[in-house]
Amino acid sequence: MIGDTMSGIIDSYIPVAIFLAVGLIMPPMTMFMVKQLSPRSKAASKYTTYESGSVPTGTARIQFNVEYYLYAIAFVLFDIEVLFLYPWATVYKGHGITSIAVVEMFVFIFILLFGYVYLWKKEALTWVK
């Protein structure tokens, strides 16, 4: 009886193992195929910057304002929040959730709103100061 239960649990993880194996094999396989199938050119003109037919002057590197990074970090944080909220809302709509889960989600949302208000008060969301 215990062996039957264990085999059922192991069988339920077979799709996860397959997904993990494919996920680990595909990136190196793709990189290998790109390296083997891509055209190769040793011409020096392939490594220069193209500027509408004119000869490039100076370097292509520029310094970005640090404010752009603040926007990027804020976007990533709020995007990850949505990734946590969407499955919760789907389960809540489909099956219903206990009141403790609702309280936990409100605490999570409160922490997110606190972070948003903090960014707003520090004027991190102001584009031009």
Swiss-Prot record:
Thermal effects: Optimum temperature is 39 degrees Celsius.
Record has Lyase as a keyword: no
Reaction(s) the record says it catalyses: methanophenazine + reduced coenzyme F420-(gamma-L-Glu)(n) = dihydromethanophenazine + oxidized coenzyme F420-(gamma-L-Glu)(n) + H(+)
Membrane-spanning residues: 9-29, 64-84, 95-115
One Pfam entry name: Oxidored_q4
InterPro entries from the UniProt entry: NAD(P)H_OxRDtase_bac/plastid (IPR023043), NADH_UbQ/plastoQ_OxRdtase_su3 (IPR000440), NDAH_ubi_oxred_su3_sf (IPR038430)
Domain of life: Archaea
GO molecular function, one term: reduced coenzyme F420 dehydrogenase activity
GO biological process, one term: methanogenesis
CC terms in the record's Gene Ontology section: NADH dehydrogenase complex; plasma membrane
Keywords on record: Cell membrane, Electron transport, Membrane, Methanogenesis, Methanol utilization, Oxidoreductase, Transmembrane, Transmembrane helix, Transport
Topology class, membrane: Multi-pass membrane protein
PANTHER family: NADH-UBIQUINONE OXIDOREDUCTASE CHAIN 3
Task performed by this protein: Component of the F(420)H(2) dehydrogenase (FPO complex) which is part of the energy-conserving F(420)H(2):heterodisulfide oxidoreductase system. The membrane-bound electron transfer system of the complex plays an important role in the metabolism of methylotrophic methanogens when the organisms grow on methanol or methylamines. Catalyzes the oxidation of methanophenazine to dihydromethanophenazine. It shuttles electrons from F(420)H(2), via FAD and iron-sulfur (Fe-S) centers, to methanophenazine (an electron carrier in the membrane).
Protein name stated in the entry: F(420)H(2) dehydrogenase subunit A
Recorded name of the encoding gene: fpoA
